[in-house]
Amino acid sequence: MKKNILIIGYGNIASRLHAILCKDSYKIYGISRSKKRGLKNFIKWDWLSKDLPNIQCNNFDSIIFIPKPTNSHQAGYQEGFLKSSENTFNFLEASKKIFYKKFITISSTGAYGLTTRHESYLDESSNIVPMFTEENPYPGDEVDLGQYIIRKYEQNQMRRYRNKLIILRLSGLYTSKPISKNHLHRATAAKIIKFFIENDFDFSSPEIFNCTEDASLFVGEKKSSYGNISNEKIKKLGFIFD
C-alpha cells in the first residue's frame, strides 16, 4: 500500500522531491495557491486566509511544511513563517480526523543570524540567542529581526508538534552556483527531505538538523571564506552529501 505524503507549500523544492520519490511507494498531495505542473493531487489553499483547505485524504505518513516569506521585509517574514504556520496548525487541529506520523518543517540557518558574527562552527546546540518566553518575549538589539522571527517560528512548531517534529535548517539555497558561504543545492535539499520521509527514527523529542554542504572554500565577489555551520549531526544519522 502506498504511503500518503502531504506537502504544504508546493514549489520548486517540493517538485524536486516529488520527482525522486518512488511512485510505487508514495502518493503525493500538494497544497499551494496555484496549480503546479505535474501535480495530480492538487489542493488549492492560501495559507494566509482563514478558509480551510478541502483535503479528502486523512491519513499521512509525513507532512512537509515549506514556508516562504511573502517579501524581504518584516511583514513578509511574519506572514511567511509565523502566520502561515499558525494557520496550518489551526486547520490540522480543526480537521481532527487527519493522522500523520511525522511533521517535517523547513526552517533556515538564518536562525543563527549573521554568521559573520561567529568565529567558531555553529551546530544545533549552539546557544545563539536566548529562548523566547512570555517573560522574555523580545531579543536584544544584537539579534536581527529575521533571526528572531525564524527562532520564534521554530519554537512555535516545537510546541505544536512535539516528538513528531523534525526541523530542517536549510542554508543558502542555490541552483547552479553558491552565493553564500553556507550553502545547499536545491536538489540536495530535496534529497534530505526524502531521507527523513523514507527513514523512521522514532525521535522522542523535536529534532533540529542543519542542512548545509561541507564547509569547503567559497569564493565570493569580494573575499573567500569557509562555511561555519556544522552538518555533522545529519551525517551521523546517515545522510551522505554528494
What do the predicted segments below correspond to?
Residues 37, 41-87:
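NAD(P)H-binding glycine-rich loop region in Rossmannoid oxidoreductase-like domains
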Residues 145-150, 167, 176-198:
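Substrate-positioning beta->alpha
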Residues 189-232, 236-239:
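Mid/C-terminal beta-alpha module of Rossmann-like enzyme folds, strongest
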Residues 89-141:
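Conserved Rossmann-fold NAD(P)-dependent oxidoreductase catalytic core, especially the SDR/UDP-sugar
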Residues 129-165:
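Active-site Tyr-X1-5-Lys
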Residues 31, 66, 103-109, 168-170:
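SDR active-site strand-loop-helix element
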Residues 5-9:
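Conserved N-terminal Rossmann-fold NAD(P)-binding element of oxidoreductases
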Residues 14-15:
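N-terminal Rossmann-fold NAD(P) dinucleotide-binding loop
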